[in-house]
UniProtKB/Swiss-Prot annotation:
Belongs to the frog skin active peptide (FSAP) family. Dermaseptin subfamily. GO terms for cellular component: extracellular region. Has antimicrobial activity. Expressed by the skin glands. It comes from the Eukaryota. This is Dermaseptin-3.2TR. It comes from Phyllomedusa trinitatis. One of its GO terms (biological process) is defense response.
């Protein structure tokens, strides 16, 4: 339902933000 859609959208948004943030920090040395 609507709740599931909101969770999906939020996860997508957070994933994008996290990727942008990690990308700006550079790759961690393993």
């Amino acid at each position: 339902g609507l709740f599931k859609t909101l969770i999906k959208g939020a996860g997508k948004m957070l994933g994008h933000v996290a990727k942008e943030f990690l990308g700006s920090q550079g790759q961690p040395e393993s």
